[in-house]
C-alpha cells in the first residue's frame, strides 16, 4: 500500500453520502477511489475523479483499492465484509458490525486469516459531548459514579418508507442507535454484569422498534441508554450522578448536522459544540453550585485517521475486533432481555 490509502465505498445512501464520503475525502492519507451505488448515472455527473460502479465486483477486483467501507443496509454488512476480505481488502463496516455474533465472528476470523484490518464505524466515540463526559468521569470530578443516563431522543411521529424503519432484518432503532449508545457506555465503564432492556414499537404504523430503554448493571452503578421517536421535549443528552456531584449536558454533537448541511470536515467551526455541560454540586446546607465545563472538540476524522494508521501498520484499529464482538453480543443479549422481560446476566 502507498502512503495514500485508496478507499472504495459500497453504498451511497445516508451513511455513505453524508458521513463516509466527506470524511474519507478530508482525512489526510486517504483518497476516495471508487463508489458502488445504484445511483451510478447521477454519481458519474457529480464525481469526475472517482470510479463509480453499479455493483461490487469491479471494485473488489481492482488492485488499486486498498480498503473497502461498507455503508449498505445492515443485512448486507457481514456478507460484503467477507467478500471484501476474501479479495484482500482492509474493511471498515458501518455500525452495526453484523446482525449476529455468529456473523461477526465469521468476519473477524476472515480478517485474521487474510491478515487484513477490520473495524466498525463507532464514530460517536468522537462526539464532543461524549469526549467531554469522558474527561469529567476520568478526572474523578463526580467522585464515585452511581448513575449515567444517555438519551438520544427524536420527534419523528411519521413512519417513513425506508429500510431502517422496515421489518427487514437489521431494521429498527435498537440496531440503529443502540450500537452507538452501548459502545459509549462500554468505553466509560467496561463490561457490565447484566442488562435489562425494553424494546418497543410505539408509533402508529411502525413496522420495527422505534423505542428502547436499557439498563446496564455494574456493581454500585447503573448506566441507562434510552432512545425514543415520540419525544418533543428531550431529556439532557447526558446526566451523570456521583458522590461529589452531577454532570448535565443538553444539546447534541453538531457534526452530523454540519455534514448534512454540507460543511466540510475540518472547516472553521467544525466539531465545536456551543452548549456547555454543567457540573452541579450541593453543600451540607443544601446550597447548589453550578459551573460550566469547557467542551472537548469533536472530530470524526480522528476515527478515519486511526483506521488509516492501522492499515499502514503504525497504529491500532479505532475499534478492535474484541470490542466489535463484545458490542454485538450486548445487542443480542439486550434483545433477549426485551423478548423475555427479564434481566439477563452477562459472563
Annotate each language-model stretch with its function:
Residues 1-4, 67-69, 265-266, 292-294, ...:
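C-terminal helix-rich "cap/oligomerization" subdomain common to oxidoreductases
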Residues 76, 96, 119-126:
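Rossmann-like NAD(P)(H) cofactor-binding subdomain of soluble oxidoreductases
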Residues 124-205, 341:
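Predominantly a Rossmann-like dinucleotide-binding segment in NAD(P)-dependent oxidoreductases
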Residues 1-47:
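N-terminal Rossmann-like dinucleotide-binding module
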Residues 183-266, 294, 301-315:
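Contiguous beta-strand/loop segments that form the cofactor/metal-binding neighborhood of enzyme cores
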Residues 106-123, 144-148:
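Rossmann-fold dehydrogenase core element
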Residues 50-110:
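Beta-loop-alpha module in the N-terminal Rossmann-like domain of NAD(P)-dependent dehydrogenases
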Amino acid at each position: 500500500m502507498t502512503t495514500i490509502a485508496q478507499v472504495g465505498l459500497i453504498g451511497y445512501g445516508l451513511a455513505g453520502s453524508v458521513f463516509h464520503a466527506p470524511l474519507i475525502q478530508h482525512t489526510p492519507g486517504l483518497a476516495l477511489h471508487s463508489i458502488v451505488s445504484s445511483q451510478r448515472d447521477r454519481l458519474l455527473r457529480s464525481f469526475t475523479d472517482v470510479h463509480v460502479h453499479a455493483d461490487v465486483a469491479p471494485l473488489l477486483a481492482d488492485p488499486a483499492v486498498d480498503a473497502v467501507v461498507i455503508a449498505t443496509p445492515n443485512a448486507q454488512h457481514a456478507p460484503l465484509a467477507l467478500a471484501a476480505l476474501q479479495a484482500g481488502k482492509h474493511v471498515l463496516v458501518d455500525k452495526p458490525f453484523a446482525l449476529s455474533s455468529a456473523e461477526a465472528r465469521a468476519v473477524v476470523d476472515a480478517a485474521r486469516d487474510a491478515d487484513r484490518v477490520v473495524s466498525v464505524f463507532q464514530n460517536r466515540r468522537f462526539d464532543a459531548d461524549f469526549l467531554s463526559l469522558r474527561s469529567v468521569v476520568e478526572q474523578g470530578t463526580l467522585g464515585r459514579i452511581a448513575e449515567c443516563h444517555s438519551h438520544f431522543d427524536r420527534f419523528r411521529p411519521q413512519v417513513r418508507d425506508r429500510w431502517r424503519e422496515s421489518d427487514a432484518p437489521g431494521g429498527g432503532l435498537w440496531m440503529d442507535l443502540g450500537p452507538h449508545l452501548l459502545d459509549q457506555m462500554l468505553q466509560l465503564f467496561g463490561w457490565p454484569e447484566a442488562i435489562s432492556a425494553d424494546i418497543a414499537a410505539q408509533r402508529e404504523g411502525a413496522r420495527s422498534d422505534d423505542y428502547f430503554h436499557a439498563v446496564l448493571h455494574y456493581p454500585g452503578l447503573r448506566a441507562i441508554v434510552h432512545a425514543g421517536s415520540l419525544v418533543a421535549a428531550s431529556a439532557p443528552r447526558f446526566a451523570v450522578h456521583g458522590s461529589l456531584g452531577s454532570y448535565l449536558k443538553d444539546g447534541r454533537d453538531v457534526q452530523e448536522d454540519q455534514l448534512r448541511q454540507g460543511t466540510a470536515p475540518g472547516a472553521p467551526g467544525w466539531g465545536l459544540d456551543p452548549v456547555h455541560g454543567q457540573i452541579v454540586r450541593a453543600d451540607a446546607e443544601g446550597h447548589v453550585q453550578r459551573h460550566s465545563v469547557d467542551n472537548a472538540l469533536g472530530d470524526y476524522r480522528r476515527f478515519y485517521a486511526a483506521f488509516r494508521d492501522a492499515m499502514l501498520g503504525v497504529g491500532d484499529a479505532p475499534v478492535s475486533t474484541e470490542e466489535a464482538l463484545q458490542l454485538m453480543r450486548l445487542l443480542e443479549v439486550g434483545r433477549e432481555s426485551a423478548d423475555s422481560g427479564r434481566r439477563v446476566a452477562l459472563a
